């Protein structure tokens, strides 16, 4: 939903999913004790000889105007290339998949042989690592991502917290509202410069997380 002169919550769907997961554990595992802890989160550089691909997606309304984005950085954290796609009207979940597919496509086109993929959408990681996709609406996107991944000799997929994905998070809104269908950024755009500099400096961000303790 979009309100005039007000920014819609781009993370509403993710927040709802996280709260639903917390409810599930509390409702179906009554012997699970949940403790809130504060973690210090930052963007981590890839291993030597690897590049890191961070991707993200957002939908202004879910479904609504959507964008899929990503950033590729080298082992020193330097910006190699970024991108933003205006997808049109779709869900945040599909926008995340578009961002991942575009990012993997760029990695293949650039002949990167070792790629660490990070994104903050655990549900996307679940469908990418699952042998079967039962949702016909996303089958082609998922298949494309899997096929592209096979063309990269060394590749890993990892979930990260939003605080470790700030640069792409900032890009996400740009993708949803930009006029061009697809834009390549050879350097950080102005709206991303500040958070990208924080990543390069290794700045930590605090995040309150739930830690589950299972009792017998």
Can you say where each PLM-predicted feature lies in the sequence?
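Primary recognition of RNase H-like, Mg2+-dependent phosphodiesterase/nuclease domains
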Residues: 1-216
């Amino acid at each position: 939903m979009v309100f005039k002169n007000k920014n819609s919550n781009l993370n509403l769907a993710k927040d709802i999913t996280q709260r639903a997961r917390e409810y599930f554990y509390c409702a179906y595992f009554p012997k699970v004790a949940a403790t809130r802890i504060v973690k210090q989160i930052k963007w981590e550089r890839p291993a030597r000889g690897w590049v890191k691909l961070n991707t993200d997606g957002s939908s202004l309304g879910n479904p609504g105007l959507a964008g899929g984005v990503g950033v590729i950085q080298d082992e020193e954290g330097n910006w190699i290339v970024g991108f933003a796609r205006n997808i049109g009207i779709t869900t945040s979940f599909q926008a995340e998949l578009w961002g991942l597919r575009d990012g993997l496509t760029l990695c293949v086109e650039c002949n990167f042989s070792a790629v660490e993929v990070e994104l903050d959408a655990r549900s996307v990681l679940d469908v990418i690592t699952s042998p079967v996709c039962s949702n016909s609406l996303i089958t082609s996107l998922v298949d494309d991502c899997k096929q592209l991944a096979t063309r990269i000799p060394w590749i890993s997929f990892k979930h990260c917290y939003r605080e470790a994905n700030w640069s792409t998070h900032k890009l996400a809104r740009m993708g949803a509202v930009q006029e061009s269908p697809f834009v390549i950024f050879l350097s950080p755009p102005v709206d991303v410069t500040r958070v990208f500099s924080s990543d390069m400096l290794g700045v930590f961000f605090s995040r309150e997380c739930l830690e589950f303790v299972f009792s017998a």
